[in-house]
Amino acid sequence: MLDAKYIKDNLQQVAEKLATRGYQFDIAEFEAQEQKRKHLQERTQDLQSQRNTISKEIGQKKAKGEDTSDIFAKVNQINEELKIIEKELKDLQDTINQTLLSMPNLPADDVPVGKDENDNVEIRRWGTPREFHPEAPAKDHSDIGEILKMIDFKAAAKVTGSRFMVLKNKIAKLHRALSQFMLDLHTEKHGYEELYVPYLVNNDSLYGTGQLPKFAADLFKLEGDFEYSLIPTAEVPITNLVRDEILDTETLPRYYTAHTPCFRSEAGSYGRDTKGMIRQHQFEKVELVHITTADKGEESLELLTSHAEKVLQKLNLPYRVMKLCTGDMGFSAKKTYDLEVWLPSQNTYREISSCSWCGDFQARRMKARHKNPSMKKPELVHTLNGSGLAVGRTLLAIIENYQQEDGSIMVPDALIKYMGGISVIK
């Protein structure tokens, strides 16, 4: 959530920045609501002051034995008016809050202005994409998996429906090995604290990180007595651990990681990536979350991104880093880098990680603050998150980049120990 005071003090600038994100901010309506809110607050305070004054008169008259019925009538009249105004004020404040909750984060100054992924800016590349012989072109990961009888989309469709998969045998083992490798790298080399978190979260958590109210259609929600939803990403439960907390500044930064399944309805992506493992309703991810101070936020994004990159480097998978434009960033993000891995079957780079600095946007929603003895009052923390990495997409990248002409898959050196010494999948 944006700072309401900052919005009031910088209306035109806020409107211009929000416009680059495709959000039309109605300044006139916002000002009218603020004017009305001020008027109602002033009227409320005036009536409360009148009531306090009259209440003193009641005490004085009673002490003298005088009649107080006329004064009680005035008090009742004030109470009735207060009841009406307070409800009107509450309804107006709810409307203003809903407007604030619907606003995306303001982009950082160095974020390129653009409409969609075509306006993103490439920052750097790592590794050289493997060249395949024209007579033996790269196969798609789903075709390789089906030939090996280790990826079964038909069985998953029978059990559940489309956009699910069943992994078998050594590819299932490779999937597990990847998550273990990622967790070990981040906890042992990068200093993250590993967490096990709930896969179901309440609405307060989803509001805290920005999934609600705007993206309710993307969630899988439980029916019945529990107001819970399946997590779309571990960012939600991890980041909400600091909701309604005042942290000791000395304990920051905090680096958290967790390996979880993620569940997304993929609303709005009908017809996109219908084949293979690119876009699934259920997938696994190793999430990275940073909780830090405002002065360290931007540099923390560079660090978090480098940690995600290290996974790809250890696996020797070619990739590029893209700085997302204003129109392509996630709702809560202030600045985002996407890591895109090379997929030879598509002859292009595809997203495998999104690393975002959210500033104090989520923290304001969550009331997540920090304080030390030298500070007059607590300040909002800055939150960051990123995939380190999406396990399924990393798996398919390995299948495609390490495929052999005989249909087998070489296991990256970094994973052989996690595979119990298996170096070839065939």
Curated annotation (Swiss-Prot):
Pathway: Aminoacyl-tRNA biosynthesis; selenocysteinyl-tRNA(Sec) biosynthesis; L-seryl-tRNA(Sec) from L-serine and tRNA(Sec): step 1/1. It catalyses: tRNA(Ser) + L-serine + ATP = L-seryl-tRNA(Ser) + AMP + diphosphate + H(+); tRNA(Sec) + L-serine + ATP = L-seryl-tRNA(Sec) + AMP + diphosphate + H(+). It holds the Pfam family tRNA-synt_2b. PROSITE patterns: AA_TRNA_LIGASE_II (PS50862). GO terms for biological process: selenocysteine biosynthetic process; seryl-tRNA aminoacylation. InterPro entries: aa-tRNA-synt_IIb, aa-tRNA-synth_II, aa-tRNA-synth_II/BPL/LPL, Ser-tRNA-ligase_type_1, Ser-tRNA-synth_1_N, SerRS_1_N_sf, SerRS_core, tRNA-bd_arm. Residues 46-55 have a biased composition (Polar residues). ATP binds at R264, S265, E266, E351, I352, S353, S354. Keywords: Aminoacyl-tRNA synthetase, ATP-binding, Cytoplasm, Ligase, Nucleotide-binding, Protein biosynthesis. It comes from the Bacteria. SUPFAM superfamilies: Class II aaRS and biotin synthetases, tRNA-binding arm. The keyword Transferase does not apply. L-serine binds at T233, A234, E235, E287, S387. One of its GO terms (cellular component) is cytoplasm. One of its GO terms (molecular function) is ATP binding. It is found in: Cytoplasm. Residues 36-66 are annotated as: Disordered. Its EC number is 6.1.1.11. Belongs to the class-II aminoacyl-tRNA synthetase family. Type-1 seryl-tRNA synthetase subfamily. Catalyzes the attachment of serine to tRNA(Ser). Is also able to aminoacylate tRNA(Sec) with serine, to form the misacylated tRNA L-seryl-tRNA(Sec), which will be further converted into selenocysteinyl-tRNA(Sec). Consists of two distinct domains, a catalytic core and a N-terminal extension that is involved in tRNA binding. Homodimer. The tRNA molecule binds across the dimer. This is Serine--tRNA ligase. The gene is serS.
